[in-house]
Amino acid sequence: MIRVIKTIDAHVGGQPLRLVVDGMPRPHGKSSAQQREWCLKHADAYRRALVNPPRGHADITAALITDPSTLQANAGLVFLDAGGYPSMSGHAVIAVTTIAFERRLALAHPPGNGEERLVFDTPAGSVHARARLELHGGARSVDSVAVTNVPAFVHAPAVPVLVGRRDLRVDIAFGGAFYAIVDSEATGVPLDAAHVPELRRLGADISASVNLTHRPVHPADSSIAGVAGVIFTGPAVDPEAHLRNVTVRASGSVDRSPGGTGTSAVMAVLDAMGLLPDHQAFVHESLSGALFRGRPLHRTIVADYPALVTEIEGSAWITGEHTFFLDDDDPFREGGSF
């Protein structure tokens, strides 16, 4: 038997997103978190096939459109990557929104000029996407997408982490996923392409250490636990940006975009330190040179944690449409990685 899966691929700042549009079973569950759990138990072979070689790679994120679980939402989203099922992905929401309007998917009403909005339920909570559309050569395209994210907060500041001979301090913060945020100057590793292998190794070691000794758990949802990766921050290269970052996921993959959930987490840390002015854009730069614009919207409380609701804006470009075959006779139909 040969199963067929169709996807539309895009990128945000060079970071790929693969949106499944046909061929995967519809996940069951009354919430996005339950739908994610259903995928893990009943459809994980599809995730492995789409994100592992030969069809995918360690750095790719995929998304599956699901039924909404709240009245306000247009759809739900379940995210898939080499490490499993992330609770939230900002760059994925930007890409999915762009695909929805430019390819006129059923969840998006016919686009006009100006702004259009979509609401997605995710395992981390509901997020609002605001697409800015423009007319280019007679066709409407999405110029940018601003995502109002779930509340971000600092879970634990200045956590001591011993990695090899390095005695580091990291801030553990949540922005849709948990991250360990560290000043690159303290590590002695520059934030440039030549040092990506070293950043990759160090990031994986820090993630492992934090998850072993200071594993964070979301106070409102215990299914969201552990750091998803490490964010190395340092001086920006682009004069428009305030900070540069390199995000290394716990699996060791490197984000080419500034990271949507990561940008929210960094903003929460800056806000807690009194370094984030109200109602001013925070421009975050990635190693690829891509920029995200973050805006603080309002403060709130998550359990006992002071939290910040942020809006993260970036742009996506569609790169292709794919038809994948999963042949039951193929011993590598689910792919794999070393």
Language model features with spans:
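Glycine-rich ThDP/TPP pyrophosphate-binding loop and its adjacent helix/strand module
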Residues: 176
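A glycine-rich beta-to-alpha transition motif near the start of alpha/beta enzyme domains, typified by
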Residues: 1-171, 180-338
